[in-house]
Design a protein with these regions (language model features):
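Conserved catalytic cores of phosphodiester-cleaving nucleases, focusing on short active-site segments
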Residues: 79-82, 86-100, 125
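Active-site or metal-binding loop neighborhoods of secreted/extracellular toxin and effector enzymes
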Residues: 119, 123-172
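Acidic-basic catalytic patches of nuclease active cores, encompassing PD-(D/E)XK
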Residues: 1-77, 83-84
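Short, structured coil/loop segments at alpha-helix boundaries
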Residues: 3-19, 29-30, 46-49, 107-111, ...
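A solvent-exposed, charged loop/short amphipathic helix patch at secondary-structure junctions
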Residues: 94-114
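Conserved phosphate-coordination/catalytic loops
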Residues: 71, 112-120
């Protein structure tokens, strides 16, 4: 089914491009299904109290925040589902800022904090769709080539599942 993410995630001005990319990938071949932005619950009190995004939520959305719809299957979340292809999809947007000029982690937290959890996520997703048999597919899409290369290298992601798909208008 299509629904909100189980863990709180909020669209802000600074991460908007990642969510736009997620919806771009989710809707590439999802017809007749359609994924979009949706109103989340009241703004999370743990969010930064004086951020511009929180202020905008209160002034323009009566305290409600935006999030995106995701595909839920077998107790697992995916960024989208392509019905005709029986393919669940995951999208990874702008992560290149965490890589140095040699395509290594720019900061000490990057490998363990960003890339390593992706391996667990991919493993969970593969297990979730296994009950659907061989017709079920999982594809991960990356907006940036360097991010995809780093993810397969540092997180050990399955390179057969990873694909580069630039976002229209973005330089990858």
């Amino acid at each position: 089914f299509i629904g909100p993410p189980l863990t709180p995630r909020y669209v802000t001005q600074s991460n908007l491009i990642n969510y736009e990319y997620q919806l771009y990938i989710a809707n590439l071949r999802s017809a007749p299904l359609r994924f979009g932005f949706m109103v989340a619950d009241k703004a999370d009190p743990d969010r930064r109290l004086f951020s511009v995004d929180t202020l905008f939520d209160y002034l323009e959305r009566d305290g409600f925040s935006r999030t995106v719809q995701e595909w839920h299957f077998n107790a697992c979340e995916f960024d989208g589902f392509w019905l005709k292809d029986c393919t669940v999809v995951e999208a990874k947007g702008r992560y290149e800022q965490f890589l140095d000029s040699d395509n290594g982690p720019k900061y000490h937290f990057v490998e363990k904090g960003i890339f390593s959890p992706w391996n667990a996520q991919m493993t969970r997703q593969k297990a979730a769709i296994s009950i659907a048999g061989h017709q079920a597919q999982l594809s991960w899409f990356f907006m940036q080539v360097r991010t995809m290369a780093a993810a397969t290298r540092f997180a050990g992601l399955d390179p057969l599942i990873c694909k580069y798909e630039p976002y229209p208008g973005e330089v990858g």
